[in-house]
Amino acid sequence: LVLIAVHIALPYLVRNYLNDKLANMGDYRGEIADVDLALWRGAYRINGLQIVKVDGKVPVPFVKAPLIEFAVSWHSLWYDHAVVAEGHFVRPQINFVDGGANKQASQTGKGTDWQEQLRKLLPITLNEVRIEDGEIAFHNFSSKPQVNINATAVNASFYNLTNVVDVKGKRDARFEGKALLQGQAPLEANATFDPLSDFEEFEFRFRARDLQLKRMNDF
């Protein structure tokens, strides 16, 4: 009975613990709706994460993620003898906002140590991150007409973020991603970088094709 009670109560305890940590994020505040645990495979799911700006009247959240799953990377544990995790973000949204002259109405992510916030959600280091069907948007609600530029259907991956694998003596992490710009123009991006540096050396490639400029006429 004790084990059953612990099994039932633990997700609520974890959720309350995380919400307590995310309540104080500098200029932002986070909240989680629910947590599901799968201890037998070293994984847990976060449902309904939302991060909003504390000051200013910004009409959209900075981050909204219906589902996030973190799990121990058994491949890295078995082959590289490293205890690291993989993250899977499903349909996440990020909204950047230009508030114009009203700086309080802007939303850029400044004012918070985001690496520290990620450490609150996950006690071990992330080595791989996958983003499935995400969206990145830029808004200006004060301009006339209003600006709304977005990349949808964002599918991307970050690999080797902790340098578990050295590639020919180099400490290379890499990023690969695809999306649709303004809902129709294929966008591709890839990068390599040293995850332990301050991005002093990195290579980034970006390409967008077949963008219909008439879609930008309103701006």
Set out the residue ranges of the language-model regions.
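Flexible beta-edge/linker motif
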Residues: 36-101, 115-137
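Short beta-strand elements
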Residues: 31-33
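Short amphipathic alpha-helical segments
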Residues: 10-14, 18, 64, 208, ...
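Short acidic/polar mixed-charge low-complexity motifs
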Residues: 28, 59, 183-185
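Elongated, acidic membrane-bridging lipid-handling scaffolds
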Residues: 24, 67, 109-215
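Flexible, surface-exposed loop regions and adjacent strand-edge segments
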Residues: 101-109
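Short, intrinsically disordered, charge-balanced linker/junction segments flanking boundaries
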Residues: 217-219
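N-terminal type II signal-anchor transmembrane helix
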Residues: 1-27
